[in-house]
């Protein structure tokens, strides 16, 4: 019996939980409605302000278009700001053109009036000068008073003659017309025209004229140095007397083709007089036409002589017989192959 009232008390307490939840939900919903109501009020307040601004801008654009002369504004898009700006620029350009036309007509009328005054005898020169001075003074006063002027795209592009350099940040810039020009005749400076002058081409000289020219002949040695013979290989030592160009026969004169004359027409022996002849040229190169020259078959027979060792054959070098006219030896000089091999007891010299 004691447990029943306890159960009844629990049953009475159970419905209190969901009721409390419902109350909490009701309070939260009520608070949410208040918040949404406040945000809605702000949006409704901002929308009329924006709409009023757009309406004002549209009304201004419509008025401007009407003043420009557009009656059918419904066909145009008044909301487009760039379109209205373009119409305004066109109107300004047209106004400036009309002003220039009026100015030109006024100047033409003034010229006609001045011509008539000059032709008439009643008006003297003093009165004309006074009228011109008065007009000049009025122009200067008007320029000083009229500070606010409408800029036109035509007048702004013209260069100001008396413009100050401090007015713009680029004060150091100069115009081409301001730079004084100096002619080449005044300064006395002449520039050579290299590309316009044709180059002169001279044909190569023949062999007879080349050899007869005294300036082309090599200098004759005056002092002969006596050197020991052991420094030179056999047949290569200095000769006792060098023949001159006049003592040589006609066979010793260089018989050369046009190719060699065109390349060496400034003198063959001026560059390297004391140098040795080139060793890469074979014995068949008969440039100077020597009389005592061996045939290729005879030289091959001499080079194929039987030697005692194979190593000595690779070291033997036969010197060429052709030489320059200045270093031409006596015809009775016999040469033999020079051996550059270093002989050792293991490799004795050939016998």
From Swiss-Prot:
Residues 1-56, 234-256, 291-351 are annotated as: Disordered. GO terms for molecular function: RNA polymerase II cis-regulatory region sequence-specific DNA binding. Transmembrane segments: none annotated. It is found in: Nucleus. The keyword Glycosyltransferase does not apply. Induction: Expressed periodically during cell division. Regulated by the SBF complex which is one critical regulator of the start of the cell cycle. GO terms for biological process: cell division; positive regulation of transcription by RNA polymerase II; re-entry into mitotic cell cycle after pheromone arrest; sporulation resulting in formation of a cellular spore. It comes from the Eukaryota. Keywords: Activator, Cell cycle, Cell division, Mitosis, Nucleus, Phosphoprotein, Stress response, Transcription, Transcription regulation. Residues 27-56, 241-256 have a biased composition (Polar residues). Phosphorylated by CDC28. The keyword DNA repair does not apply. Its main location: nucleus. Residues 1-26 have a biased composition (Basic and acidic residues). The modification Phosphoserine is found at residues 152, 168, 314. One of its GO terms (cellular component) is chromatin. Belongs to the POG1 family. Transcriptional activator which promotes cell cycle recovery with CLN2, after pheromone induced G1 arrest, probably inhibiting the ability of STE20 to activate the pheromone response pathway. Binds the promoters of genes that function in cell cycle regulation, cytoskeletal organization, and spindle assembly. May also be involved in stress-resistance. Present with 736 molecules/cell in log phase SD medium. This is Transcriptional activator POG1. It comes from Saccharomyces cerevisiae (strain ATCC 204508 / S288c).
């Amino acid at each position: 019996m004691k447990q029943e009232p306890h159960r009844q008390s629990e049953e009475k307490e159970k419905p209190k939980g969901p009721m409390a939840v419902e109350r909490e939900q009701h309070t939260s919903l009520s608070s949410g409605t208040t918040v949404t109501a406040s945000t809605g009020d702000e949006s409704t307040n901002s929308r009329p302000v924006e709409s009023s601004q757009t309406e004002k801008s549209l009304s201004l654009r419509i008025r401007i278009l009407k003043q420009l002369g557009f009656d059918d504004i419904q066909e145009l898009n008044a909301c487009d700001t760039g379109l209205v700006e373009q119409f305004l620029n066109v109107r300004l350009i047209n106004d400036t053109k009309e002003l220039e036309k009026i100015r030109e007509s006024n100047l033409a009328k003034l010229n006609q009036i001045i011509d008539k005054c000059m032709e008439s005898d009643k008006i003297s020169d003093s009165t004309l000068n006074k009228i011109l001075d008065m007009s000049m003074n009025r122009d200067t006063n008007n320029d000083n008073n009229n500070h606010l002027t409408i800029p036109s795209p035509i007048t702004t592009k013209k260069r100001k003659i008396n413009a100050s350099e401090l007015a713009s940040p680029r004060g150091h810039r100069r115009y081409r017309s301001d730079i004084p020009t100096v002619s080449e005749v005044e300064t006395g400076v002449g520039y050579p025209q290299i590309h316009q002058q044709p180059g002169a081409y001279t044909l190569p000289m023949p062999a007879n004229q080349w050899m007869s020219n005294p300036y082309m002949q090599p200098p004759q040695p005056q002092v002969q140095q006596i050197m020991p013979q052991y420094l030179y290989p056999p047949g290569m030592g200095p000769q006792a007397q060098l023949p001159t160009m006049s003592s040589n026969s006609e066979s010793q004169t260089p018989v050369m083709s046009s190719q060699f004359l065109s390349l060496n027409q400034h003198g063959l022996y001026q560059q390297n007089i004391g140098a040795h002849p080139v060793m890469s040229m074979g014995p068949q190169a008969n440039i100077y036409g020597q009389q005592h020259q061996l045939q290729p078959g005879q030289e091959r027979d001499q080079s194929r002589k039987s030697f005692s060792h194979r190593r000595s054959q690779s070291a033997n070098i036969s010197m060429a017989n052709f030489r320059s006219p200045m270093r031409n030896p006596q015809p009775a000089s016999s040469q033999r192959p020079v051996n550059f091999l270093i002989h050792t007891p293991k490799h004795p010299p050939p016998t």
